[in-house]
Each structure stands twice: as structure tokens, then as C-alpha cells.
Regions:
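Basic nucleic-acid-binding interfaces
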Residues: 2-39, 48-91
Length: 91
């Protein structure tokens, strides 16, 4: 859980958008309650109550910086940061 909180803090600070690991971003979004659908290299995340659909693609094991910014804006606009502290109930 500490690793997820560290990644969330890093994303919210916005200082290193080019250095966010893709696998960590996927885990964080699932922890926030997003559902994932995969089509090829596109990982599509959606959540009830959130109008935006997040479409992420890995690039050399990292997230693309503009996609990290999109995720940050969704987390801030919908106040999802507190949900990352909740225990993960999905396996």
C-alpha cells in the first residue's frame, strides 16, 4: 500500500510524468476502482460516475507523459485520491 501511495503522490505532484511505470499506473487505477478493458496495446479504464474514459498505452514500460496528466486531472477533478487508501477488495 505504501508503494501505491508513493506513486499516487508522484503523479499528483506532476514533477516526473515521463517516469511513471505503466504497471504501477494500471495497479493504481484498479485500486481507485476503475475497470480495465484491453484491446491490443490499449488499456481502457472506466469508472461509474466518471465521464472521462482513460485510454493508456505503454511506451518502453512507462506511461506516456500526456496520459499521466490526463489521469492526474481525473483524480483531482473527481477527488479520487482518498480511494487509494482503501483496501483492495478485487483479486
Amino acid at each position: 500500500m505504501a508503494r501505491a501511495n508513493k506513486l499516487l503522490d508522484q503523479i499528483l505532484r506532476g514533477g516526473a510524468d515521463a517516469n511513471i511505470p505503466f504497471s504501477g499506473m494500471v495497479q493504481l487505477l484498479k485500486r481507485l476502482g476503475f475497470q480495465e478493458r484491453v484491446k491490443g496495446s490499449h488499456h481502457i479504464f472506466f469508472l461509474d460516475g466518471v465521464a472521462e474514459i482513460l485510454n493508456l498505452q505503454p511506451q518502453s514500460g512507462k506511461c506516456k507523459p500526456y496520459q499521466v496528466k490526463q489521469v492526474r486531472n481525473v483524480i483531482i477533478n473527481y477527488r479520487l485520491a482518498g480511494k487509494a487508501d482503501a483496501p483492495d477488495t478485487k483479486s
